[in-house]
């Protein structure tokens, strides 16, 4: 499947420009491992900058998360990759959805399935899928970029250290960051008023899923 510019344009017109951004909740996942290191460094003029990078990447840790204009929502860390069963458990147990919200996901296979839709609609919410290959329309991708930058600097070389760094990185995503990400992706206009009562973040810590 390729990027469809018509679908992207239709999304901007029917969702990004029409839907109240306070109704939108983006759900996605990102991966990290113990080999993450900084990509850039400063050095004296004429000198190369060096750093050590582990040869062993270690087992991947997947972070399932949601984000609204309020900030990061409930998050779940899973050792290894996720499957549909894990994703359905996250949707059922973790997100603090409110009736009337619209849950937005990309087209990853694990995000699709009738059970996922049922769980969301049971809470009085609607489910929408982004146009294919459109990370630029997904504000949580920008949050993940900031989180990965923090993880690279943290250089957690054990799973415990990586998880701890993930918690700090999630804490660093403020409601103001979230609103900036929404604005950059076209869902929020500069100066657009938001209800003050919704400005408190729903993030309440990182939940770990045991093997």
Please identify what each model-predicted range represents.
Residues 1-211:
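Short functional hotspots at interaction and active-site rims
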């Amino acid at each position: 499947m390729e990027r469809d510019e018509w679908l992207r344009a239709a999304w901007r017109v029917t969702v990004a420009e029409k839907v109240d951004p306070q109704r939108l909740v983006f759900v996605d996942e990102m991966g990290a491992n113990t080999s993450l290191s900084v990509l850039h460094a400063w050095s004296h003029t004429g000198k190369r900058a060096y750093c050590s990078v582990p040869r062993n990447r270690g087992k991947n840790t997947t972070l399932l998360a949601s984000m609204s204009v309020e900030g990061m929502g409930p998050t779940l860390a899973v050792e290894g990759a996720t499957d549909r069963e894990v994703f359905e458990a996250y949707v059922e147990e973790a997100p603090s959805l409110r009736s009337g919200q619209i849950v937005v996901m990309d087209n990853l296979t694990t995000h699709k399935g009738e059970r996922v839709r049922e769980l969301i609609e049971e809470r009085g919410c609607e489910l929408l899928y982004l146009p294919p290959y459109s990370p630029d329309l997904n504000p949580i991708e920008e949050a993940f970029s900031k989180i990965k930058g923090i993880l690279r600097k943290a250089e957690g070389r054990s799973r415990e250290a990586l998880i701890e760094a993930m918690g700090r990185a999630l804490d660093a995503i403020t409601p103001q960051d979230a609103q900036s990400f929404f604005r950059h992706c076209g869902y929020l206009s500069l100066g657009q008023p938001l209800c003050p009562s919704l400005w408190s973040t729903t993030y309440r810590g990182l939940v770990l899923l045991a093997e």
